[in-house]
């Protein structure tokens, strides 16, 4: 979508008007300015005083959010932006009173039809003018993509690009000083959206923070379909019930927890962990565990090994890496359930085949090949040449939890390797614009058993200091040229009190416990190559 703007002649008048208005007046008078943009129609323009809840009656029920607590004083603007004759995005722009001269766009999650209101609140609290969208459809299902290529295009890349263009223009109209720098913050699908911006729209953002990025998107979905091929249903000998996954996890941790020098129930570097399962297998004279929950059979051991192994195409190329060890208990509850994953079922029904009757239990390598060949709007997001973004002066910080139970952290390693090989840059050269941090004890995007509070999203925000907050670390890198050597994470107890901190290393460095003293002391750890 092309957006043209016709406001230069009235710019001086607008500047005078802004200077003479209060923040509240400027907000309530902003509707006409929004509506003057091509293909944009305001639906809500309101001043919201901080420290109150805002009701969200139009938010899709599947988004599971009916209100949002707003921390800072903001001008809230909701609007519909037409992206084609058959598609549109719902977008919100929040303009804080405590504006710091920075613009920011946030991403989505899953199939991405939910505005991330917590991120809007989090970033406006930090002084960003922030925008977010529904990614072109409402709710968490992919059903909106059925026979709707323009809606799918919004999901693939156009929604964030449109939000950046419209959001930047509105920011310049709302604040006399405009904005100095532009940023992006997202995780999972939002991480993929960040890299899509880097690859396809290198001038949209000065700094991109992309957590647990779902790049290799098509192959990630096929891997999700492949899981059922491996586990089978609950009646098959290949299936493991949750209790057996607990045994598997305990064995993984027994073998791998101490590889980093500390017995802390965390795996710092899953690349070093190659567990075997002879010690928990049932006696060799039993082909079945007869319902025992104390040992696994040979068939079940093969299931575990396959899930931890890469998924290959028939030509020997890797489609997607296996799941990293250490994530077994949560992954078993969400992915290894003995039924096909909804993620794969919906994508193949509503995108690949446009057939609502497609049976996900029949998934095989031919389906993965069909999906990869289709790759609509290059949603794979696997371009290895990031030179346009680099030449534009952009910076990337990506992070991935080593306990991620949905998107294997090995995927971020593989993408880093792909960029390294494509651009022919050594890690120290990549460090000039692209840094990857492995976060031990972080699950998918946030939470987990370790020092996972790094400020990559609203749920993981604890401190605003650049050393403790990945978003503010990006600001310091872009605006002061100070690149982060580490990202400090904080472990909180159940009452929200800090237990310990840990400095998470930039890849390819790994964390090793050197002592002396407790592993709870961040200075007892060292980043080594």
Swiss-Prot record:
Per the UniProt entry, the glycosylated residues are 53, 64, 85, 98, 138, 233, 286, 290, 354
UniProt entry keywords in alphabetical sequence:
Calcium, Carbohydrate metabolism, Disulfide bond, Glycoprotein, Hydrolase, Metal-binding, Polysaccharide degradation, Secreted, Serine esterase, Signal, Xylan degradation
Molecular function GO terms recorded: feruloyl esterase activity; metal ion binding
User: One GO biological process from the UniProt record?
Assistant: xylan catabolic process
One cellular component term (GO) for this entry is:
extracellular region
Q: Pfam families, alphabetically?
A: Tannase
Q: What does this protein do?
A: Involved in degradation of plant cell walls. Hydrolyzes the feruloyl-arabinose ester bond in arabinoxylans as well as the feruloyl-galactose and feruloyl-arabinose ester bonds in pectin.
Query: What is the protein name stated in its UniProt record?
Result: Probable feruloyl esterase B-1
Task: Name the encoding gene, please.
Answer: faeB-1
